[in-house]
């Protein structure tokens, strides 16, 4: 029985032969999280403006602001990764220098969701 795969570019397939769709998307998301949005990038092509929305200036004590940030992040992820059909983003923990998120995504042709727990600390997402 063949396992379902997600359509990816030829270059991606050549680099990641044998990697599961979940692992491939996880790696791509980690690249997204460790990149920044270009300021004033509204006029640039989408290929040049992918990146993580900045959260350091967000009031982490305000739930409405955190919900807004989750919506912005969700939109950025869905623009970046077309193999995600459904995505939920929620804040697990938020402090001045750290932010912990929970992501649950349904990928094309995959019966099981991809679940990620990701946290920002010491200048990078892990």
From Swiss-Prot:
NCBIfam families per UniProt: PRK14128.1-2
Lineage of the species this protein comes from: Bacteria, Pseudomonadati, Pseudomonadota, Gammaproteobacteria, Enterobacterales
Function: Inhibits RpoS proteolysis by regulating RssB activity, thereby increasing the stability of the sigma stress factor RpoS during oxidative stress. Its effect on RpoS stability is due to its interaction with RssB, which probably blocks the interaction of RssB with RpoS, and the consequent delivery of the RssB-RpoS complex to the ClpXP protein degradation pathway.
Subunit structure: Interacts with RssB.
Subcellular location: Cytoplasm
Protein name (record): Anti-adapter protein IraD
Organism: Salmonella paratyphi A (strain ATCC 9150 / SARB42)
Keyword Cell membrane: no
Keyword Cytoplasm in annotation: yes
GO biological process, one term: cellular response to oxidative stress
Stretches assigned to coiled coil: none
InterPro entries with a match to the protein in the record: Anti-adapt_IraD (IPR023776), IraD/Gp25-like (IPR007048)
Pfam families membership: GPW_gp25
Gene Ontology cellular component terms for the protein in this record: cytoplasm
